[in-house]
């Protein structure tokens, strides 16, 4: 499972580093493991795509090719594939569900919904929230 923590560490100037959830760990499951999260990879150059997909796999995620750079908007904020912790099969179903322009239109709803999660939402709270906004009804 991807883990997040809330940090209020201070810099040497006394300023807070971050109040946002920060990725501190991930599932690093072996290839073929049930529950392994998918990461979308887009690109126009097959060799570069292959290198990227190998890096994603070696990091413990299932690389899922999402198409060309021109089609990479399908994995932008508020699209069905964005920040929802999907496994590969669901991620592949998510790409064609994205409708151009709808992600941008959903951003205000996403921002408003984060304000309702409280000061220290759990990772599950954030993912449930993202899925409720990003996945088409």
UniProtKB/Swiss-Prot annotation:
Region (Disordered) residue spans:
1-20
Gene3D superfamilies reported in the protein's UniProt record: NAD(P)-binding Rossmann-like Domain (3.40.50.720)
Instruction: Give the protein's recorded name.
Output: Putative protein YjhV
- Taxonomic lineage from the root: Bacteria, Pseudomonadati, Pseudomonadota, Gammaproteobacteria, Enterobacterales
Misc. remarks from the entry:
Encoded in the KpLE2 phage-like element.
Question: Compositional bias (Polar residues) spans?
Answer: 1-16
Superkingdom of the source species: Bacteria
